[in-house]
Design a protein with these regions (language model features):
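Signature aromatic-anchored transmembrane alpha helix within multi-pass, membrane-resident enzymes
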Residues: 17, 229, 372-408
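Transmembrane alpha-helices and membrane-interface helical segments
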Residues: 110, 114, 164-171, 203-211, ...
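Start-transfer (signal-anchor) and selected internal transmembrane alpha helices
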Residues: 1-31
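Transmembrane catalytic cores of multi-pass membrane glycosyltransferases
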Residues: 27-46, 54-77, 194-201, 208-359
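Short periplasmic/luminal acceptor-recognition loop of GT-C membrane glycosyltransferases, typified by
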Residues: 423-494, 503-523
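Aromatic/acidic, Gly/Pro-rich catalytic loop(s) in extracytoplasmic/lumenal soluble domains
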Residues: 501-562
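Active-site lumenal/periplasmic loops and adjacent helix-entry segments of GT-C-fold
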Residues: 23-133, 140-163, 191-198
Length: 562
């Protein structure tokens, strides 16, 4: 009987892995069709793509005022960009990252399925956990949990690694000698994703710190110190190797760079603690994820003797991991307070994005609660529930991966009803921009700069054209600590924010002769300052006329524009 069950489980494992691989392959094919050359993909990936393209083709960006600062971006390299650089030549760096990202999505399904199999043994419950973990859950600070929402970004690889760190941490509960190993690997995860690794380290440290029972005070203190050092050593090495060359903003320009940072991150960081409180409140009342997890935790602790051994071990880590997140927030608040009183920029704000780990901890608690009753449900019903959840998510899910997978399947099978209106809109916008970029390449002179009033970084990574700084470039401008570029970027952003036609003033007074804009409604007004080179439903491409350029140069010399 056991042999039959073993074979059935192995067959289920193989089937689920193949289905996950098929979904990820369809999502990749759909994404490559919806976003040719990466055009229109996630803006973080666009930023990485332009940095990689500038590194591979420096001559093409010799006149780009920002490209020389790209090496100062602390977000590059990361595991995603490093793996993308190893792929055989694709269309460009953007498509290479999309291919690596598809691997990340597949590993996400696989990692949480393995975690579920180790905790519960049941393939159906493991599949349920894997599906729950993939669901996109919005969080504060411009981040989210899950693998389905957008094009895969670097943090997905830490999410792939985290289940294995969690399993190793469970093993370390009974074998304390493994605790420093877990902490050391958590520190090494800085190479994967820095923000996640720092909050992950706090979670594991506090989880181990609370495991003091049956251990003398001094022995426990010594082990805790060793855990802390095991985590700190790789973190410090990472900071020294990868961030030591990042210049600090000059003290006399502290206010200038504070303004750059505030403007660049105004959308995600306008009110840090209120934003965090709002999202905690949202998942407490309108969407009761956290109350459900708390109830699950209470039931699990009450019935812990009925739990499987691995689940009982995981439950011992849970309180410490939640307290680790809280402790990480307290340390961030303290550092931010000190930075404000010392008149410098804080360094810990980004770590608060790691509070999103409250979501997977909640999913784990709810799935552990299900494990108490799962075996009492008829096998056919168990499998049916998992299949039903998967079908509902594939049918109703609005995440980019689901939309792309359905688009690819509709295209390959000739089933138009499978496609979505969102996919059709994404493709139409991407093709419209691709046509505009092709016209830009054909029309641009060898020494001409491009100006675009949106974050159209495809000018750099798809058309390989030098471009004036866009809003997203504020990040690297902040870390480059160049006062002149900071002033220039701020002036451009303020002029564009002043009114709907502010971008025209930037185009007329800056060095870029070419304008690529989505403001097709301003066509008549724009033709007063330049010649139309290309247009479609979404984009206009113009070259500034020499007369307008001379007039604006005279205005600038008179002091009016300044």
């Amino acid at each position: 009987m056991k042999e039959t069950e073993y074979k059935r489980h192995r067959l289920a494992d193989l089937l689920l892995v193949l289905l996950a691989a098929l979904f990820c392959w369809c999502a990749l094919q759909g994404t490559l069709d919806l976003n040719p050359q990466g055009i229109g993909m996630d803006s973080d990936l666009q930023n990485y793509a332009q940095i990689m393209e500038a590194g591979e083709c420096p001559a093409a960006f010799a006149r780009d005022p920002v490209a020389s600062f790209f090496p100062q971006d602390p977000g590059v390299p990361n595991l995603l960009t490093a793996l993308a650089g190893l792929l055989p030549d694709g269309d460009n760096a953007a498509t290479d990252m999309l291919r690596v990202g598809a691997l990340g999505v597949f590993l996400h399904f696989l990692a949480y399925y393995i975690l579920g199999r180790c905790l519960f043994r049941s393939p159906s419950l493991a599949a349920l956990l894997s599906i729950l973990m993939s669901i996109a859950v919005h969080w504060s600070f411009g981040t989210f949990w899950g693998s389905m929402r957008s094009d895969p970004v670097p943090r997905i690889f830490y999410a792939d690694l985290w289940p294995f760190l969690l399993l190793l941490a469970c093993a370390a509960v009974k074998r304390p000698s493994l605790q420093p190993v877990v902490m050391f690997l958590s520190g090494c995860a800085m190479l994967v994703h820095t923000v996640s690794a720092l909050m992950g380290g706090a979670m594991f440290f506090m989880a181990f710190f609370l495991l003091w029972r049956d251990r003398g005070l001094w022995r426990h203190a010594g082990l805790s110190l060793l855990n802390l050092l095991s985590f700190a050593v790789p973190v410090v090495i990472y900071l020294k190797v990868f961030l030591a060359d990042t210049p600090a903003p000059p003290v006399e320009y502290a206010g200038l760079f504070a303004e750059v940072r505030a403007l660049r991150y105004s959308k995600d960081w306008h009110d840090v603690w209120q934003s965090l409180a709002d999202i905690l409140r949202y998942y407490t009342f309108p969407v009761p994820l956290f109350p459900a997890a708390a109830v699950a935790a209470a039931i699990l602790f009450k019935k812990r003797q009925q739990l499987a051994g691995p689940v009982r071990t995981l439950l011992r880590l849970m309180p410490g991991m939640v307290l680790g997140i809280a402790g990480g927030c307290v340390l961030c608040a303290l550092e931010m307070w000190l930075a404000r009183h010392l008149g410098r920029q804080n360094m810990s704000q980004e770590i608060l994005r790691g509070t999103r780990f409250l979501v997977p901890l909640s999913w784990l608690l709810l799935t552990c609660l299900l494990s108490l009753y799962w075996q009492g449900v008829a096998p056919l019903l168990r499998r049916g529930l998992v299949i039903l959840l998967a079908v509902v998510l594939l049918s109703l899910g609005q995440g980019k991966q689901v939309v792309a997978a359905r688009h690819a399947l509709a295209d390959m099978a000739g089933l138009g009803w499978l496609d979505t209106e969102e996919a059709r809109q994404i493709k139409a916008h991407s093709l419209g921009l691709r046509d505009a970029l092709q016209a830009l390449r054909a029309q641009a002179g060898p020494e001409e700069l491009v100006f675009t009033d949106g974050d159209c970084m495809a000018v750099r990574f798809a058309a390989r054209m030098p471009m004036l700084p866009v809003h997203k470039d504020g990040n690297v401008i902040y870390y480059a600590a160049d006062p002149d570029m900071a002033r220039r970027w701020l002036a451009m952003q303020h002029r564009m924010a002043a009114d709907a036609t502010g971008y025209m003033e930037v185009w007329r007074t800056e060095q870029a002769a070419l304008l690529l804009t989505r403001h097709v409604e301003h066509k008549a007004l724009l033709l007063r300052y330049g010649a139309l080179l290309f247009e479609n439903e979404d984009w206009l491409l113009l070259r500034r006329s020499p007369v307008a350029a001379d007039a604006d140069a005279q205005v600038t010399r008179s002091g009016y524009a300044d």
